[in-house]
Amino acid sequence: MKQEASEQARKGQAGSLLERLRFAGLDEDACALLRDHRQALSPRIELALRALSHRLQASPDAARHFDSDRQIDRLHDLQSSHWNVLTDARFDGLYAERVKVLADTESRMGLDPRWQIASHAIVLEHLILGAIEDAWPKSILSLGKARRRELRDLVAALVRAAFVDTEIAVSLRFNALRQQHQRQLSEQRRDDESELKTLFADFLRALGEGDLTARLPEDAPDTYQPIVAGLNTALGQIRDALLAADKRATAAEAIVSDLRGSAAEFSGNAGAEAKAIDQHLVSLGTVTERIRTGSIRIGETEAQASRTRIAVERSGEIAGQAISAMADIEASAEKIGQIIGVIDEIAFQTNLLALNAGIEAARAGESGRGFAVVAQEVRALAQRSGEAAREIKQLVTGTKGQVVAGVEIVGRTQHAISSIAEQVVSINEAVTGIAREAECQVNDLASATSEIGGVAQAMNRSAALAGAALASTDDLHGVIVELGETIRRFHLDRQARSAASFAPRMRIEAPEDETTSPFGEVTSERHLAGWRR
């Protein structure tokens, strides 16, 4: 379908071009003549385009359309290509393409058609003058040169005058068409605005009053049918959405009320629990401190028990040393007894010897009396030595018995000390175990205190969050209530107005069980109940 339309447009353009060529008298012979002189015309065209570029740069009115010299060079290249195709005089698709490219480029640059006419005038002037120059017979006479110069000036003046007149006429016509087009656009705009006001005024007034049952008439002009249908559909969807939002807002209001109660209760409970946990945390800290103090004292007791164990062990060692010393004393007493026995035997033998000496002295008579006295003294000394030996033996025997009793007592003491040492070791081990358990309990209580402190902080944060949630639910409740009131300000009842027969200016009588709101719409008891809520 598009290809057919494009083909028809192309044929129409070709027919229009042929008609223009026919009207201008450009038949095949004229086109062939142009092609024959194409090589001679090309240098003249290039000179003319250079002159055109200089004039465009020198003219302030023309130069303001160009941002840089590169745009002028670009225009020069396009015009050179255009004149190259034009002097080929075939007027085919390539020519149409070149014409369109040049026209689009000049349009983008903001050049009016007057500049196109002026550029053609300059090129045509150079071409005509060049043709006259080439065709004029060479003459050495000054009269011929003067006539040639006069003819050139005349032709140039005629070309300039004709194209200036054409440019002015085209500019005036173009301005007139543009003004006419602007007037037509203004009139069309006023007509459209008037039609839009007629079509939308009552509709917009009803919407401003909050009546969402208002609809645009279905017999609107075809131009506005898509807008009318779209607006009516959109309003229907908005009405349905607001009705659903009204129901959901009512349900949300009830839910938020429940949430407010739950949040308030949770906030109170969380605060009370946080205070209770803080109190328990203080008590637990006191208990932990007491257990830590007890643990320190248990450690001191453990050290004291260790010192006691060492002292008892030393006492056992001393008792052992005492037993060893008493054993040595007993051995010495035994030896002393033996020595005393020897002394007693010596005293007995000495007594016998003294007795025998006395007997012998008595037998000797007077000569042995001195010896008898000595013997008597020796006997007395022997008796005293024997008595002393017996006394010492009795003392040594008593001492030996006492030493044996002391050894037995010291042995029992050593056994008791050993038992005490074992008990002290057991007590020390028990105290060490108690100290370790106390230290573990202190660490466990410290961990429990830290965890309970974390729980207390969490409860405090929960209480704060609950308070914030309560405040948020209060705000949300207020927002939902305001949303419900805002929704209920709109007129959403379809029975009050008919979408098909919308008459914005017609006054609607409210039933007896309905009330007219300050917005001018009919408000049902259900809406009033929502407002009361």
From Swiss-Prot:
Q: Which UniProt keywords apply?
A: Chemotaxis, Transducer
The residues that cross the membrane are none
Presence of keyword DNA damage: no
Signal peptide stretch: none
GO terms (molecular function) for this protein are: heme binding; oxygen binding; transmembrane signaling receptor activity
Q: Which domain of life is it from?
A: Bacteria
Report the Pfam families cross-referenced here: MCPsignal (PF00015), Protoglobin (PF11563)
Give an example GO biological process: chemotaxis
Identify the stretch(es) annotated as Disordered.
501-533
Can you supply one Gene Ontology CC term for this chain's record? membrane
Instruction: Show the InterPro entries listed in the entry.
Output: Chemotax_Me-accpt_rcpt (IPR004090), Globin-like_sf (IPR009050), Globin-sensor_dom (IPR044398), Globin/Proto (IPR012292), HAMP_dom (IPR003660), MCP_chemotaxis (IPR051310), MCPsignal_dom (IPR004089), Protoglobin_sensor_dom (IPR039379)
Compositionally biased intervals (Basic and acidic residues): 523-533
Methyl-accepting transducer domain residues are 248-477
Sequence similarity: Belongs to the methyl-accepting chemotaxis (MCP) protein family.
- Its protein name is Probable chemoreceptor McpE
Task: Give the species.
Answer: Rhizobium meliloti (strain 1021)
- What gene name is listed for this protein? mcpE
